[in-house]
């Protein structure tokens, strides 16, 4: 349950921040605040922090990573992007000697599920969204997913790690899938293509040349 009241905040500080037996704090609140403030407090208290909160991390990447560095603690957020795929660890670990020039991928499972069902079963956006919500794949309020906000958060984190350049999620040109119709799906199919929501960014000559979260028609296989 998100901690919002001042009383709950006091409990957090007393039972967690000031507890010398706690070395690692796992943030599971969701949202930007109070999650960001609580993570910063934990770091300043000398505690390592683990989080999958892509919204807070993308919005305050510099603050969180710098606070961790200044206080000699670790800030781990692998699960914030791509779930069980260790993409962030790969970037900062096994592949860190590489020069990354481009990021491109489907960054949100909910939108991919919706577009796939619309394509393969000739269903409307509204029908598939309701199906996804009934199955627990989509939230009751799906805005963050279907309008590309979730994917923009993930792209922001990926760029920060791969390119060492931070771009705030709100500065990433973003287009969701809520306006995609069965006519759009059919038009793509006539060209032997499918519609996907792709997050992409590219570095050229040390400059971020292109970044977006847009619809791309991909050839079917």
List the predicted regions and their residue ranges.
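Single conserved hydrophobic/aromatic residue that forms the stacking wall/gate
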Residues: 1-8, 12, 214-220
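Substrate-binding/catalytic subdomain of NAD(P)-dependent oxidoreductase enzymes
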Residues: 128-213, 217
